[in-house]
């Protein structure tokens, strides 16, 4: 897929996955592992993909190269769903250098038994990789959401490569009828939400850049109305509610607390309130967390278990 004249999408879609990171339900729409190639006088590949799709990714890369050879593999984020293809790439393209933060190279030793000492290029905040006609300026983004993370900015086409920032659940070959925000919100608060102050820090850096395109490592490439996405991330990372409404989260064994919650929800709705109710024993925990941050009020209705409150209960708990 052509993003700009010289930047191509070479990522893959995963429709076999049921739980992303072993806990987030993506069984309906799958997951995308994004990767990109920048075709300057020199060629840089931005990130790899999950281990089950390395061959497909390398095939996509070969097609985009059209007979040329890559000069660099740029690693923005070392999580295995983005770094599993490193060894195969380095073996296939023995002349290529690998570009990453020092923290990423430390992880490579643990992952692959080497940090490619003869071929590595360590970069940090403010460093520039000149590709001839294009360049990547690196932006430190620690703890968004891993400590080694870098963003990079391509100034010619005004593209931000944002690692897991601005990511979204869902494969890219499926159109999400709910739009970007719903699954991007669930993704953000499940995976990145703990690190709001670090997201705020990188957003301040991004404010100084003329960004026309955002290329994340999950979800669609963002090309229009970028102010909306940046403003939304500012809201999420500053822990401000998006909407007026009430999230009620509960766990009930024998149904007594459930009945009380249903009565409360009905009474609130009768007063014109927007109410979102989650049974934490049965409903998707990530969706409950999503709505807890989305709305401006939260009710936690708890059973008791051995004299303590218990929202997540064991099988012999009683309310």
Feature-to-residue mapping (PLM):
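Metallo-beta-lactamase
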Residues: 2-5, 50, 100-216, 220-224
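Conserved beta-strand hairpin/beta-sheet module of binuclear metal-dependent hydrolase folds
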Residues: 2-65, 151-154, 158-162, 257
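Active-site metal-binding motif and surrounding structural segment of the metallo-beta-lactamase
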Residues: 41, 52-99
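Active-site neighborhood of phospho(di)ester-bond hydrolases with catalytic His/Asp-centered motifs
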Residues: 46-48, 71-78, 99-101, 160-163, ...
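Short acidic loop-to-helix transition motifs that present clustered carboxylates
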Residues: 79-81, 105, 280-286
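N-terminal beta1-alpha1-beta2 submodule of the flavodoxin-like/Rossmannoid cofactor-binding fold
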Residues: 225-312
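Conserved small/polar residues in nucleotide/adenosyl-binding loops
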Residues: 313-319
């Amino acid at each position: 897929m052509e993003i700009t004249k010289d930047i191509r999408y070479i990522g893959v879609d995963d429709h076999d996955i049921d739980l992303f990171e072993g806990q987030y339900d993506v069984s309906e729409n799958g997951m995308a592992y994004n990767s990109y190639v920048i075709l300057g006088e020199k060629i840089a590949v931005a990130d790899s993909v999950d281990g089950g799709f390395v061959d497909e990714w390398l095939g996509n890369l070969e097609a985009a190269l059209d007979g040329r050879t890559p000069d660099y593999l740029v690693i923005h984020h070392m999580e295995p769903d983005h770094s599993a293809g490193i060894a195969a790439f380095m073996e296939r393209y023995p002349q290529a250098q690998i570009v990453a933060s020092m923290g990423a190279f430390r992880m490579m030793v643990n992952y692959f038994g080497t940090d490619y000492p003869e071929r590595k290029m360590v970069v940090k905040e403010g460093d520039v990789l000149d590709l001839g006609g294009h360049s990547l300026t690196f932006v430190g983004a620690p703890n968004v959401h891993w400590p080694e993370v870098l963003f990079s900015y391509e100034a010619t086409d005004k593209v931000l490569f944002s690692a897991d920032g601005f990511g979204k659940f869902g494969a890219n070959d499926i159109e999400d009828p709910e739009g970007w925000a719903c699954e991007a919100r669930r993704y953000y608060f499940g995976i990145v939400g703990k690190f709001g102050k670090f997201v705020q820090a990188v957003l301040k850096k991004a404010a100084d850049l003329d960004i026309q395109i955002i290329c994340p490592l999950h979800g669609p490439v963002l090309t229009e109305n970028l102010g909306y996405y940046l403003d939304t991330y500012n809201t999420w990372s500053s822990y401000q509610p998006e909407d007026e409404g009430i999230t009620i989260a509960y766990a009930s064994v024998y149904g007594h607390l459930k009945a009380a919650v249903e009565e409360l929800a009905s009474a609130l709705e009768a007063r014109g309130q927007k109410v979102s109710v989650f049974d934490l024993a049965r409903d998707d925990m990530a969706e409950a967390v999503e709505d807890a941050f989305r709305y401006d009020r939260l009710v936690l209705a708890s059973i008791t278990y051995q004299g303590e409150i218990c929202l997540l209960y064991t099988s012999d708990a009683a309310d």
